[in-house]
């Protein structure tokens, strides 16, 4: 494991029925503070179905980038499917820090 391969601050941007939850904006704010100190980017992980058009809202609240996983399998929140999707993003992108709500 080479630490230089791990970078940026990732946030799980929670949504319910296409509505971004306030906790996502709170996490983005804290992530922005940390990323600024570390001179890194804030990357939001945004999962669900029919949500692509909401990604810009996350940029407006502090994300530098949004990874959108928009698929019918994620229409309803099922922790196993969401956990697998988030785990795959983390394995692929190697964030230095990750902010998730405790009940993912």
Identify what each model region corresponds to.
Residues 1-104:
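N-terminal glycine-rich FAD/FM-binding segment characteristic of electron-transfer flavoproteins
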